[in-house]
């Protein structure tokens, strides 16, 4: 269950940013997570609630923005959606794609007090 580890890292980032900006409380965290990262959102939300207990982010709302997968076909040079690794180009059927979006995992923003 890598969601628990991810939440630990997220809380570390939150603490660093909040301390550096002299914040008292974190109200909301916005995460960007690529569709191809394979994160279970329910497990992530559960882990976040557990990990943030007793921290500056204890009652923070967790908002997850999913970034769809996208790739450039190495054959026809078209930009195509990618729902999973090893998808084929929807234009020419080639399997040689270069991923351009979908593996993101970052804290996009925080609302603090």
Curated annotation (Swiss-Prot):
Function per UniProt = Involved in the maturation of [NiFe] hydrogenases. Required for nickel insertion into the metal center of the hydrogenase.
Which key words tag this protein in UniProt?
Answer: Metal-binding, Nickel, Zinc
Instruction: Give the family per the record.
Output: Belongs to the HypA/HybF family.
Which GO MF terms does the UniProt record name?
A: nickel cation binding; zinc ion binding
Origin species, per record, is: Legionella pneumophila (strain Corby)
Q: Name one Pfam family in it.
A: HypA
An example GO biological process term is: protein modification process
Which HAMAP family does its entry note? HypA_HybF
InterPro entries per record: Hydgase_Ni_incorp_HypA/HybF_CS (IPR020538), HypA/HybF (IPR000688)
Q: What are the binding positions for Zn(2+) in this chain?
A: 73, 76, 89, 92
What is the protein named?
Hydrogenase maturation factor HypA
Which domain of life does this protein belong to? Bacteria
Name the positions where Ni(2+) binds.
Answer: 2
């Amino acid at each position: 269950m890598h969601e628990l580890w991810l939440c630990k890292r997220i809380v570390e980032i939150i603490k660093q940013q909040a301390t550096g900006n002299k914040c008292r409380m974190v109200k909301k965290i916005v995460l960007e997570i690529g569709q191809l990262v394979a994160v279970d959102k329910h497990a992530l939300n559960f882990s976040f609630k557990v990990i943030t207990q007793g921290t500056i982010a204890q009652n923070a709302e967790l908002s997850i923005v999913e970034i769809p997968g996208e790739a450039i076909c190495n054959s026809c040079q078209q930009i195509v959606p990618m729902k999973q690794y090893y998808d084929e180009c929807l234009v020419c059927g080639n399997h040689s794609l270069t991923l351009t979006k979908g593996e993101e995992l970052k804290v996009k923003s925080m609302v603090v007090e």
